[in-house]
Amino acid sequence: MTSQRTRERLIQRLYEEGLSNAQVLEVIRRTPRHLFVDEALAHRAYEDTALPIGHNQTISQPYMVARMSELLLAAGPLDKVLEIGTGSGYQTAVLAQLVERVFSVERIKVLQDRAKERLVELNLRNVVFRWGDGWEGWPALAPYNGIIVTAVATDVPQALLDQLAPGGRLVIPVGSGEVQQLMLIIREDEGFSRHVLGAVRFVPLLNGPLA
């Protein structure tokens, strides 16, 4: 079930659901999602669904990975992106093939260590990792042209807004429980523009690093 035909079916489905960025779709097509899930779930890797990866975390559904990547890239190529929530490393791997540099923060060290191994296996060398609190971002290396958050925050973290470069784009799910909305926030000359893009479902963005 990890055949090229299975991957092509996934890409066709994403296209039919309205995703149109050819570069993003090509990266999704060639990225081996089965490497980012447990072997017991590998037969489901190219279903358009989230899957558990342990520690009460999930690998996001391919549609959402592609959608959030499209939103980041909508204004053109990016050279410096901050990812909050490395998780399995799948979204990280997709970003690493779309932008010049990725800086990824994860609070669960064992998940990030596994993600590092997978990216090395795929020879993706333009990612720098930090084990820490995603609510804080990575201020030492700010600002970022794009920020993507792969867990739902109860509110938009001020630290992430502060670390967004002028013209930069922040893609983040906001809310709690059953009420979550995907938001696109753009840093403008006079402040921030906010766009609500529809209902989503993510695991919560928690505070503090966890070994």
Swiss-Prot record:
PANTHER family in alphabetical order: PROTEIN-L-ISOASPARTATE O-METHYLTRANSFERASE, PROTEIN-L-ISOASPARTATE(D-ASPARTATE) O-METHYLTRANSFERASE
Highest taxon, organism lineage: Bacteria
Protein name: Protein-L-isoaspartate O-methyltransferase
Function: Catalyzes the methyl esterification of L-isoaspartyl residues in peptides and proteins that result from spontaneous decomposition of normal L-aspartyl and L-asparaginyl residues. It plays a role in the repair and/or degradation of damaged proteins.
EC class name: transferase
Pfam family, one: PCMT
InterPro entries found in the cross-reference section: PCMT, SAM-dependent_MTases_sf
Family according to the record: Belongs to the methyltransferase superfamily. L-isoaspartyl/D-aspartyl protein methyltransferase family.
Cellular location(s): Cytoplasm
Gene Ontology terms for molecular function: protein-L-isoaspartate (D-aspartate) O-methyltransferase activity
UniProt keyword list: Cytoplasm, Methyltransferase, S-adenosyl-L-methionine, Transferase
GO cellular component, one term: cytoplasm
Keyword S-adenosyl-L-methionine: yes
EC number per UniProt: 2.1.1.77
Chief site of localization: cytoplasm
Disulfide links within the chain: none
Originating species: Pseudomonas fluorescens (strain SBW25)
CDD domains per UniProt: AdoMet_MTases (cd02440)
UniProt-annotated catalytic positions: 60
